[in-house]
């Protein structure tokens, strides 16, 4: 595994800060919203994290992490646009919740793969993207994502947002 570059460190630190703010926002407000300051900071940091991911090419060129970065950028932009314009009417809250919650998934999949292929430094837990431990983490994250999304949709429906 190549060493982490300066942009890689910046990307990692911003990404960790983003995730921490995202969890805080989720547990405080039940869903992310551009109208809540912690959520807004999360979304800006997520956008920066995703854009910096597009500049990291030390692992063999354009890959799945870059696709996740593009999806995260699109999710943030679409979610903010729909939340601010309410263009989808009553479905707007569901749509921006889908977009913003999806950014957690787009963070976690490449982060888990990269972390498991780097740590511990002397003997990483995984050798490749297709290592079973990475696949298990990815399956767990997808399950958590769908449970969280269903919970949020039920909460939105019950609150008539």
Question: Model segments located where?
Answer:
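Alpha-helical membrane insertion/targeting regions
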Residues: 1-161
């Amino acid at each position: 595994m190549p060493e982490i570059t300066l942009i890689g460190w910046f990307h990692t630190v911003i990404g960790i800060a983003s995730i921490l703010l995202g969890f805080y926002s989720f547990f405080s407000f039940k869903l992310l919203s551009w109208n809540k300051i912690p959520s807004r900071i999360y979304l800006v940091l997520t956008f920066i994290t995703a854009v910096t991911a597009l500049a990291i090419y030390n692992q063999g060129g354009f890959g799945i992490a870059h696709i996740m970065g593009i999806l995260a950028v699109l999710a943030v932009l679409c979610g903010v646009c729909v939340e601010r314009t309410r263009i989808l009417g009553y479905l707007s809250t569901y749509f921006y919740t889908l977009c913003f919650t999806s950014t957690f998934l787009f963070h976690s999949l490449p982060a888990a793969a990269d972390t498991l292929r780097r740590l511990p430094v002397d003997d990483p837990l995984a050798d490749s993207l297709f290592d079973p431990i990475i696949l298990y983490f990815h399956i767990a994250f997808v399950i958590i994502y769908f449970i969280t999304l269903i919970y949020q949709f039920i909460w939105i429906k019950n609150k008539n947002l």
